[in-house]
Amino acid sequence: MKWSWLVGMSVLCLGLEISPAVATEQLVIATSPSMRIPVEALGRLFEQTHPEIRVRLFFDSGLDIRRAIAAMENSSIGQYFIGSGPIHLVAPGGDELITRLEWRYYVLPGTKRPFAEVPLVMVVPEALVDAPTSFEALAKHETLRIAVGDPELTTLGQRTRQLLTTLGVWGHVEHRLDKASDTRSVLDHLLNGEADVGILFGPDAVQESQRIRIVAVSERGIIPPVIHSMAMERYCPNRALCEEFLGFIQSDEAQSELRRLGYASPSSQSMKKRNKP
């Protein structure tokens, strides 16, 4: 991958119509397509109180983001120096990827900030009146068919099995599971009447809130959380601006917006632990 690919990368301008005369500086975030909705929302909020800043997003898969940064930094043609790179922040989706970037020093150690957790939620069609109100209640509702992601094929299914097993429910409901190949199929099975309830990730459920409703949310601490973090790219061109944005994504205003989108706020303990240099 050539470094020039990054220099000429296509970025997406976010929502506010800020005139070039007002927006004098860009803040570029490299992120994965799966993180588009929350990172866009954070960017818009930040622009509202920083009219001189235009937040732009560069999209690629987490693995390709890592490769692109590596190519940019290791190329003898396109080497950057501290404070001169094209990327400010990195939000690849999932802390495993961002930890790998830390190990390679592609992001600055000590700058990782968790901003969202991804809960599992139980959903039902809007028309269903007598719905269970907890995951544990699934064991008692012996006639309910449950749409879940296939644990052998999907992360959603693996997380669902882990949660229900930890709660002591999996063995009681396994014969009633309608296993689907992806999130879209879980929704289709539920809305087509092939299942009575479904289990999804919170953000996916919120996007379908006009057709389904959430009746239960997994509690923190039952299974290891899925955490999304953001960190400063090693050659970030404006560290003060990056630090301000990293602080903003953990603010009450930002967290309220993320909860509206179906995410959970990282625990205060998680934030403190990851904020240590």
Model-derived segments and spans:
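Bacterial N-terminal signal peptides
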Residues: 6-17
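Exported/periplasmic ABC-transporter solute-binding proteins
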Residues: 22-50, 54-73, 77-88, 92-277
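Positively charged n-region of N-terminal signal peptides that target proteins for export
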Residues: 1-4
